[in-house]
């Protein structure tokens, strides 16, 4: 609920008492417009008044003579030159701000080990397209959806690829339980219980308890409408489950926890034909660090060459344990789910696509006769099980749920975009075919309402309300 958690304030309070934090207080005497924010922050983080006063007094003793000397020495020459450069004042001020920003964000951090690791993270975030923010990375994809839809003379043509699947063909924002419902009788579909706010609170608690008793803990708690793991919880006890169910402000579902490796499969069927094939398979890798008995979890994150690329995310996910020294040999998984949004790595694994897997996924997809394009989240005990076609489906996505190939840094950018573009074309072709068969088009307003509901969420389960 709050932007800043209490345990985060405690962690930052410790930092403010460190030499680096004390240096910030001293430097506020020298940087214009920084004193008031520094004083307020020091108060919020409970820095003692005697220490704060002593630091400011020492800074004043250093700064005041220097300021007076600079004013008396450089003041008269500056005032003589001021009229000549007055017309460039705006550019000079902008340049000064740019210099200050560059100095504080790049030069100052480079003076410490952690700062240099932060620079590594920043440089990778700029240079590796797979690490770009989603709104930038997927902008060409969204423009492609619009352009291809206009080519088929209907802006929502893609939503007709899967008639009667969910409310909007399985597009972003469709209810998860509705997309899973056609497949529930298949043993390869993860056991799921949908609970609506239309039911009474006691009914929801009773049904949830019965589900947990049947399938055991942990169970997975998910909002009906969410993307990229937003709002997801792993529930380990009956007390946690009851608290979540009673506090729910939206429809949600419970799922049996399925261990094993996690994969993402994009599947298509050619319009008007009884076929089907896998277009892409992505393996969701865990990001792990191993303790040495000396380093804290935060230090291990900054040390690891993989984890450092998304260090800020992992620091938020594990905010409570950052100062804990990890015992030697103990492995810590940094991503808390298989979602990229929670830190998992995405790897294209075309070598895992076998004839058996292709046939098994196609057989599963045909449980819903109108399905032409879908993305399935799979769990398998091993790579061999997956290649043999033995898996459990935990989620189903419909139209325009393209694969996470763009998040695979090992692929050339042009290759991953070409693959995603091919998936979009397959989805649009199916939608256009169904429209020619007189399928009712999905209203644009309903499509946008669903999309905005899913994208409007800001709760990342790893840093949201505590359990």
PLM segments and residue spans:
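A short glycine-rich, hydrophobically flanked beta-strand micro-motif that places a catalytic Asp/Glu
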Residues: 256, 263-266, 371-385
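C-terminal active-site "lid" helix and adjoining low-complexity regulatory extension at the edge
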Residues: 381-467
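ATP-binding N-terminal substructure of ATP-dependent carboxylate-amine bond-forming enzymes
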Residues: 95, 99, 103-186, 197-206
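ATP-dependent carboxylate/phosphate-activation module, predominantly the ATP-grasp catalytic core
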Residues: 268-367, 397, 402-427
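Transmembrane alpha-helical segments of integral membrane proteins
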Residues: 65-77
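Hydrophobic residues within alpha-helical transmembrane segments
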Residues: 27-31, 54, 58, 62, ...
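Membrane-interfacial helix-loop-helix
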Residues: 1-47, 51, 75-92, 105-114
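Active-site nucleotide/adenylate-binding loops and adjacent lid/helix of ATP-dependent enzymes
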Residues: 50, 164-165, 175-312, 354-358
